[in-house]
């Protein structure tokens, strides 16, 4: 039987279909590769936008560590460069004490660690942090119990986890580490994860105060009513007649170098200057507590709405600092009532008296 020859028309049709199929395969491959490249670019873009100072997706519970800021202890500061927030407030004798907040850091030496004061609990609680200290005042001891604060008191712990450095003088030589804090927290059965959001409203990159709020020439008085930014390359904060803190702006690093009573503060392990990207000033009054020991211990009137300043990248704006209760998170707002955006970087929060003569220039 003779095979029928395929017509030219049919051959042409099949050839066309083969060509179309090849083009579809090539086009599909190109589409897939192109989309993979696009997906990769989108992923890279998302990763670039992730904050550097703290992982906001992390559920790790922070640690709040009390840090000695006595004149003889400042030369022993260690680990502050790993803290993403540092609070500073008055203590007895006109001196200040620090509380450093750590999260997702492996810091070998933090200190020098000092005793608790009751109002620092308010800021540990608003961060849902495990509170770390070495000793306590009677008021702090009572409040830790009443408020059910998850705390670690170094006096009650092993010298392997809270240790004194022999070449430094006591009581300014007590140190701990994040590894020790985690070990003790797990032993005590404390939660080591938290769903609480950050106290600060961070943005990716720098908060451009000049662009967002406009700028007004002059000193502090110029910005109090208008809410605009002023130049802020030098900041002086008198916590008391005995304790003045100064920050000088370094344009190269776009951070502020910290000074105490005219001397630059450094990390004694690294030798690096202590610097901060952001400064927040909250102005609320302190008062002397009446107790039988008469040591001049202080209380803080920090519940309510208070004036303050937010400072970053060489500019400052006036803000309102609102705290509704001891456990409530402080809200930092501009004069229009909007939560301020905070630059991606570490922050020192200075809590000073309402009548303090703040200098910003």
PLM feature spans:
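Hydrophobic single-pass membrane-insertion segments
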Residues: 28-42
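A surface/extracellular/periplasmic glyco- and lipid-processing/surface-interacting theme
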Residues: 10-13, 39-83, 92-361
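Hydrophobic membrane-insertion alpha-helices, especially the h-region
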Residues: 16-28
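N-terminal Lys/Arg-rich, disordered targeting/topogenic segments
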Residues: 1-13
């Amino acid at each position: 039987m003779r095979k029928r020859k395929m017509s030219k028309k049919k051959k042409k049709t099949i050839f066309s279909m083969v060509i179309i199929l090849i083009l579809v395969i090539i086009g599909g491959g190109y589409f897939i590769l192109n989309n993979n490249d696009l997906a990769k670019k989108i992923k890279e873009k998302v990763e670039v936008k992730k904050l550097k100072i703290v992982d906001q997706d992390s559920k790790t519970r922070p640690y709040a560590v009390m840090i000695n800021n006595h004149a003889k202890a400042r030369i022993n500061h260690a680990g502050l460069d790993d803290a993403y927030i540092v609070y500073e407030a008055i203590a007895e004798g006109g001196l200040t004490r620090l509380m450093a907040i750590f999260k997702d850091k492996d810091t070998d030496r933090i200190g020098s660690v000092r005793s608790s004061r009751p109002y620092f609990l308010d800021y540990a609680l608003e961060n849902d942090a495990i509170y770390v200290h070495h000793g306590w005042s009677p008021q702090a001891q009572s409040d830790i119990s009443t408020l059910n604060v998850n705390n670690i008191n170094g006096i009650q712990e092993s010298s392997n986890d809270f240790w004194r450095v022999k070449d430094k003088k006591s009581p300014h030589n007590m140190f701990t580490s994040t590894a020790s804090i985690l070990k003790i927290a797990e032993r005590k059965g404390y939660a080591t994860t938290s769903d609480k959001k950050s106290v600060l409203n961070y943005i990716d990159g720098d908060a451009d105060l000049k662009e967002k709020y406009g700028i007004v020439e002059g000193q502090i008085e110029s910005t109090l009513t208008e809410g605009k930014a002023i130049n802020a390359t030098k900041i002086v904060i008198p916590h008391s007649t005995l304790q003045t803190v100064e920050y000088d702006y370094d344009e190269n690093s776009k951070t502020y170098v910290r000074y105490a009573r005219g001397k630059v503060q450094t990390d004694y392990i690294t030798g690096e200057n202590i610097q901060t990207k952001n400064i927040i000033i909250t102005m609320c009054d302190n008062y002397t507590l009446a107790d039988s020991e008469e040591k001049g211990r202080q209380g803080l009137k920090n519940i309510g709405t208070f004036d303050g300043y937010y400072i970053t990248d060489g500019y400052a704006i006036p803000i309102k600092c609102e705290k509704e209760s001891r456990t409530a998170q402080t809200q930092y707002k501009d004069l229009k009532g909007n939560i301020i955006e905070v630059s991606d970087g570490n922050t020192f929060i200075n809590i000073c008296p309402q009548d303090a003569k703040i200098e910003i220039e």
